[in-house]
Amino acid sequence: GGVGPDAATSGGMGGTGGDPGAVGGRGNSGAAGGAGAVAGASGAAGTIIAGNGGNGGAGGAGYAADGPAGPAIGNGGDGGHGGAGGFYGNGGAGGAGGNSAPGGGTGGNGGTGGDSGAMGSSGGRGGDGGVGTNGGAGGGGGNATSYGTANATGGAGGDGGTGSTGNGGSGGDGGNGGTGHGGGGGPGGTAINYGAGDAFGGAAGKGGTGVVGGNGGSGGAAYNYGTGNATGAGGSSGSGGAASVPNSASTATATSGSGGAGGDGTDGGNGGSGGFAFTFGTGNIIAGVGGGGGTGSTGVGGIGGSGGGADINNGAFTVVPQGGAGGHGGDGATDGGAGGAGGFTEIDSSASVIAATGGAGGDGGSGGTGRGGTGGGGTGGGGTGGGGGVGINNGSGEAIGGAPGAGGTGAVGGDGGQGGAAYSYGTGDATGSAGAAGTAGTTGVGGTGGAGGAAYTLNGASTATATGGIGGNGGDGGTANGSNGGNGGAGGYASTTGTGTASVGNGGRGGDGTATVATGGTGGVGGNAHAPAGSPVPGVGGKGGNPGPGGKPGPNGADGIVV
């Protein structure tokens, strides 16, 4: 199609993409709209076998009446939608939104993929949002359907446009929001398969960044009604956008976006992580939560997304901060998905007097015939960490590990999450959180208790106490003969370089075996203590679980030692 002419207030319409001219050909892309606030045309549909849909035309740019440096008139035009694919064909990509100083245009949606049959097809990718004071939204990914033997894959959501001083656009890798909001992520496309192939939900867009970050988009769902080796997987979701307030005189709130939910499918998609939130100011801070895992209709549930971190760098900050909560693991027909870890909380200023508490871990999803999901441990006090989270407080307030998530239910009980760790570089106490208890098995063995979070005071002049978390109790065994109780979690390690006390967590109790010849779980090991100039108090090992009829009691856990 021809390019539309420029105009003072509205550009000409972009030409429509033509039909494909040969077998296996492709529809031509729609041409760009002229300068102004007009939309690009949509691509034409593929009309023959294996004909792909044409791409949507790009939206026109906002016209500058007084020259390139003058005020612009109108927002950028919207991108055209991608055309639908013909039989076996792929959907066309959505056109990008036009750029304009007042606001970028919205990206077009991806076209729907044709029946994939034996060759496979995909939905088109959503168009990216245009750049402007406020970024344009990214388009949604196209859907795809299959009745044959090949795969059907939903298209990815489009990226959000950059907001130079205002709002970031919706979509993956959204633009910076300046002083405004980041846009939400574009959703992934849905995939449906009635044949023997796979169905893959499309990936979602990420949220845009801003003082208020945009939420990640939801992953595309996948539905598989066929037979054979068909295993549909829900699309993973987008992460939440970051949020930053770099002005120490500001009282604004920094709110990062939440992660999107994983798509449902034969296997559930994973949830997106919450966005990171940072402030030099004295206003509030709200870290985004992790997205939940998708449901697995015949397989496993998706993993919950991690909570976003919260970082404060102003001693006058008075609102008690906390990292974002981890997302819930998705339920599964076989295994439940693991819960997401809680976000960290970090206080950088030595003048601060408030506590830093890590975010809570998400609960594990429920399983059917398989194992329940493992609960995600919260990250404590400030920094990042694997398993149990790391927390950092450089002020006089306490560093506290985040609460862990519970294990999911299942034939075999889910393991409890590990307690969040805590680090104090200032003069405050450090307290690791207790590990979560393992979940009882409905028919099988009980889940293992989570380990207690470690605690560290790392200031040689400090008299503060480091307290390791208590290990979680093991879950009881289920109804089937020989289903043993779960083991107790280990007590958290405690260490101080100052003259205070290092008090260590005790090991968790082993779960009971309730069925015939079932053995009780082993008690958790008591934590070790390290305090060269202070007072070390090692943890006591956990008691072993009680046996079922004809079984044996579980052994007690070993006591901790001074190291």
Residue positions per predicted region:
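Collagen triple-helix signature
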Residues: 1-563
